[in-house]
Amino acid sequence: MTIKILPPQLANQIAAGEVVERPASVVKELIENSLDAGATHIQIEIENGGANLIRIRDNGIGIAKDELHLALARHATSKIASLDDLEMILSLGFRGEALASISSVSRLTLTSRTAQQNEAWQVYAQGRDMETSITPASHPIGTTVEVANLFFNTPARRKFLRTDKTEFAHIDEVIRRIALAKPQVAFTLTHNNKLIHRYKSAVTNEQKIKRIATICGNDFMQNALHIDWKHNDLHLSGWVIQPQFARHQNDLNYCYINGRMVRDKVITHAIRQAYSEYLNNEQYPAFVLFIDLNPNEVDVNVHPTKHEVRFHQARLIHDFIYQGMTNALTSEQTNIPIQSEQSNPTKVAEPQGIWNLTTHNKGNRATAGKNIFAQQPKDYDKKSSQFKPHFTANYSEVTPKKAVQKAYAELLVTHEEKTIASSTLPHQFTHNATYISEQKNVLHALALIENKALLLQQNQQYFLLSIQALQHFNIRLQLQQSNIAQQTLLIPILLRLNKQQYQSWQQQALFFQQSGFDFTENSAQHRITLNRLPICLRTQNIQKIILHLLDQPHEKYTIFLTALCSQLEFPSLSTFSEAVNLLTKTEQQFSTQHQPEFQSLLVKIEWDHYLDKLQ
């Protein structure tokens, strides 16, 4: 078969396979067009689950007569004009494929009128390559799109449609998702001439909350926590459910990026990680989250349905969302009231940048959205950014390099009985510790027991060393160094304290400083902001640890340090080399004064009881 260009109608039907999955896909694309046209009231009429008729009517700016024939052409759009526009998508639609794809698999009628025209005009297409004719019509300012007999010319696609009830349920869900993102727009939904939903325009905060309660349920709003978290050009807002009211189905999660509903693994993982210590595998969080960021930092041109996005700095977005979620969940647990801006006009805002308001004068794009984001500072270099993740899932210490693992392997020796392989710590790693430097008193690491303890041998004595105790001891040693390695947080952590916690903070501020923490304090608002933390604690739930320390004041630094280490959580070690690596790292920080504390961690194994059983 020779290579040839596909006929336009066939090409459109192939494109429709990606854009038009089911009637709900048509509804989504048409409503997004209405929103981009600046509509404030959208009517959606459905018949037989959308298979027979989908009618979307809006009061947007309309389409001029001489542009109607272009509206149904492929890759024709008023929303972008250059590559620069593509890199900063402000509208919901931009590909110029929706109407062409829909018209190729249905009988489509488009009627529109602009404010500059005295009469409306109508164009019709019915799934085949033909010249469209424009005829006069009666219509108010705005646009109406009728999609009849969906998939009438592709029987295989129509065969895969589900029942009318199921297809309408998908349409209803699409409208719910859009209505949450656009509270200022009124929506009316009917099915088979029966009114299903009427969402009135919501302008005030009370009206917006009422719309969310209408869509998500009163139970959600009554048990939800409000989020308003900012950092430079990043802004996270919305509502998240309290952990104790988690759901058993993953059916109430709505996430939007710059007003666009999305499904993204980075966001999902950050949210799930924030809830990880509260929920089990059979529980799911519920949330309505709005993420605003510089359009240059997110690529929405990933898939024709525009559900998927790609972040240029995924780790930054992940940690920003995680910290915002964790802050909200932790604040609720400490009974910190969430006040509105009106009730607390002098409140101190979270660290944030100055947003620059600019608009575009490109016809339809002016109604599609505004660029509310300032340009990145010139001295900001993504590639040379010093940012490193300080909250990660399934974190484990860096595994030894192959050369180190080889060195460990060479240290494995076999006893005369050839029953137990032992590993001796290299001399260059052990010269500081008295318990190892003594001749003939060398500790041998023999094995990792159930991933919980190291089996050690010293002459004819055997000991168990708890991995968890060793991990805590390792951190304790690092926090007692004269120069504690610190990591500057790209997103400072803001903590709101109650009166008792703030008094505790004043008593223990020096202890935090000794441990490598760097805070700025706002005494008037009882707030502290963590700017730097010990690098050894970068994977910990640091907000939880700090609040725990403030809930229980400590008079001495040693007691404070013990309480801090008791709150640490570590991943389990799964290999012998990881355990030996941890022991080596701990030993490198040793001094003579630490020997008694280390010796207290060793549990001597008494063999007499077991040997007696062998007789």
Curated annotation (Swiss-Prot):
NCBIfam families: mutl, PRK00095.1-1
Alphabetical keyword list: DNA damage, DNA repair
Protein name: DNA mismatch repair protein MutL
Protein family: Belongs to the DNA mismatch repair MutL/HexB family.
A GO BP annotation: mismatch repair
UniProt GO molecular function: ATP binding; ATP hydrolysis activity; ATP-dependent DNA damage sensor activity; mismatched DNA binding
GO terms for cellular component: mismatch repair complex
Any Pfam family: DNA_mis_repair
